[in-house]
């Protein structure tokens, strides 16, 4: 069984899917896939073009937003991931090799819109442990506050920001 970890009602993370796993992603109700794993990363896995074809064969919208571990905190990388979160149909499944980079990128985006500790709490509730990055999340968010992308981002609000990014409340 393919592992999918729900972070919010509209966003989940997981490891690199194999070809057969795109059916499981669709059957789990996901509408889109974000691939964070670069094509030149070591290991045996699907290249982005192959993953896109498999996703589209299942009726899934596909986005390629590659980042290696060293580029996670670059503003362009975070902006690209945020655009995918805004533009893709929901719910979204995001992956890298293990799901950790996808989780960190989600937290970086969420921290632009709410307190980093709340994003960390959502990930902790989903079984992810990235609390050690709270200072980095806060610093990254401070770099973009007030930027044109943040100020004109009505699309993020209209898609239900609280559902995608979490509202910081635990049930």
Regions found by a protein language model. Name each.
Residues 96:
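Short cysteine clusters
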């Amino acid at each position: 069984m393919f592992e999918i970890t729900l972070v919010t009602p509209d966003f989940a993370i997981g490891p690199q899917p194999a070809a057969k796993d795109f059916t499981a992603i669709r059957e789990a109700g996901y509408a889109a896939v974000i691939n964070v794993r670069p094509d030149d990363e070591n290991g045996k896995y699907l290249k982005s073009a192959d993953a896109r074809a498999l996703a589209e064969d299942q009726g899934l919208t596909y986005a390629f937003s590659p980042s290696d571990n060293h580029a996670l905190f670059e503003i362009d990388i975070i902006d690209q991931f945020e655009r995918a979160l805004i533009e893709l149909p929901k719910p979204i499944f995001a992956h890298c090799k293990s799901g950790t980079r996808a989780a960190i990128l989600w937290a970086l985006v969420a921290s632009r819109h709410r307190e980093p500790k709340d994003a960390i709490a959502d990930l902790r509730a989903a079984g992810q442990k990235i609390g050690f990055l709270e200072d980095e999340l806060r610093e990254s968010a401070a770099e973009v506050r007030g930027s044109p992308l943040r100020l004109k981002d009505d699309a993020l609000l209209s898609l239900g920001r609280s559902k995608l990014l979490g509202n910081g409340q635990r049930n």
